[in-house]
Protein backbone atom coordinates (compact mmCIF):
# COMPACT_ATOMS: atom_id res chain seq x y z
CA UNK A 1 0.00 0.00 0.00
CA UNK A 2 1.38 3.40 -1.00
CA UNK A 3 2.17 5.91 1.70
CA UNK A 4 0.18 9.15 1.44
CA UNK A 5 1.05 12.63 2.63
CA UNK A 6 -0.78 15.92 2.78
CA UNK A 7 1.34 17.57 0.08
CA UNK A 8 2.02 21.22 0.88
CA UNK A 9 2.90 21.99 -2.74
CA UNK A 10 -0.18 20.43 -4.35
CA UNK A 11 -2.37 21.24 -1.33
CA UNK A 12 -3.96 17.77 -1.36
CA UNK A 13 -3.51 14.19 -0.20
CA UNK A 14 -1.16 12.39 -2.58
CA UNK A 15 1.25 9.47 -2.77
CA UNK A 16 4.34 10.17 -0.70
CA UNK A 17 7.96 9.48 -1.44
CA UNK A 18 9.19 5.93 -0.88
CA UNK A 19 12.12 7.05 1.25
CA UNK A 20 13.91 10.21 2.38
CA UNK A 21 15.73 11.57 -0.68
CA UNK A 22 17.41 14.59 0.91
CA UNK A 23 19.56 14.58 4.06
CA UNK A 24 18.93 16.24 7.40
CA UNK A 25 15.94 18.07 8.84
CA UNK A 26 14.99 19.49 5.46
CA UNK A 27 14.97 15.97 4.03
CA UNK A 28 12.64 14.83 6.82
CA UNK A 29 10.36 17.81 6.13
CA UNK A 30 10.28 16.93 2.42
CA UNK A 31 9.60 13.25 3.16
CA UNK A 32 6.73 14.12 5.51
CA UNK A 33 5.12 16.91 3.45
CA UNK A 34 5.93 16.54 -0.26
CA UNK A 35 4.36 14.06 -2.69
CA UNK A 36 6.06 12.06 -5.44
CA UNK A 37 4.33 14.26 -8.01
CA UNK A 38 5.56 17.51 -6.44
CA UNK A 39 9.08 16.09 -6.07
CA UNK A 40 9.11 15.17 -9.78
CA UNK A 41 8.06 18.74 -10.64
CA UNK A 42 10.90 20.06 -8.49
CA UNK A 43 13.42 17.72 -10.13
CA UNK A 44 12.60 19.08 -13.58
CA UNK A 45 12.94 22.67 -12.31
CA UNK A 46 16.18 21.73 -10.55
CA UNK A 47 17.65 20.31 -13.76
CA UNK A 48 16.72 23.47 -15.64
CA UNK A 49 18.31 25.65 -12.94
CA UNK A 50 21.53 23.64 -12.91
CA UNK A 51 21.82 23.78 -16.69
CA UNK A 52 20.78 27.39 -17.30
CA UNK A 53 22.80 28.86 -14.44
CA UNK A 54 25.69 26.41 -14.99
CA UNK A 55 25.67 25.45 -11.32
CA UNK A 56 28.47 23.24 -10.02
CA UNK A 57 27.24 20.83 -7.35
CA UNK A 58 30.78 20.64 -5.95
CA UNK A 59 30.51 24.35 -5.10
CA UNK A 60 28.99 24.99 -1.65
CA UNK A 61 27.46 28.32 -2.73
CA UNK A 62 25.75 26.72 -5.74
CA UNK A 63 24.33 23.93 -3.56
CA UNK A 64 23.08 26.49 -1.03
CA UNK A 65 21.42 28.50 -3.83
CA UNK A 66 19.74 25.36 -5.18
CA UNK A 67 18.52 24.39 -1.70
CA UNK A 68 17.03 27.87 -1.20
CA UNK A 69 15.24 27.57 -4.54
CA UNK A 70 13.94 24.12 -3.53
CA UNK A 71 12.48 25.43 -0.26
CA UNK A 72 10.93 28.41 -2.06
CA UNK A 73 9.38 26.13 -4.70
CA UNK A 74 8.13 23.30 -2.49
CA UNK A 75 7.11 25.14 0.68
CA UNK A 76 6.61 28.84 -0.08
CA UNK A 77 4.74 28.64 -3.38
CA UNK A 78 7.34 30.64 -5.30
CA UNK A 79 8.05 29.63 -8.87
CA UNK A 80 11.62 29.15 -10.03
CA UNK A 81 12.95 32.05 -12.13
CA UNK A 82 14.91 30.66 -15.07
CA UNK A 83 16.38 33.39 -17.27
CA UNK A 84 15.83 32.90 -20.97
CA UNK A 85 13.30 30.09 -20.53
CA UNK A 86 10.01 30.53 -22.36
CA UNK A 87 7.39 27.81 -21.74
CA UNK A 88 6.18 26.07 -24.87
CA UNK A 89 2.71 27.24 -25.90
CA UNK A 90 0.04 24.73 -26.84
CA UNK A 91 -1.02 25.03 -30.47
CA UNK A 92 -4.73 25.49 -30.80
Curated annotation (Swiss-Prot):
Gene3D superfamilies: Fe(II) trafficking protein YggX. The keyword Cytoplasm does not apply. One of its GO terms (molecular function) is iron ion binding. Keywords: Iron. One of its GO terms (biological process) is cellular response to oxidative stress. One of its GO terms (cellular component) is cytosol. Transmembrane segments: none annotated. It comes from the Bacteria. PANTHER family: FE(2+)-TRAFFICKING PROTEIN-RELATED. Belongs to the Fe(2+)-trafficking protein family. Could be a mediator in iron transactions between iron acquisition and iron-requiring processes, such as synthesis and/or repair of Fe-S clusters in biosynthetic enzymes. This is Probable Fe(2+)-trafficking protein.
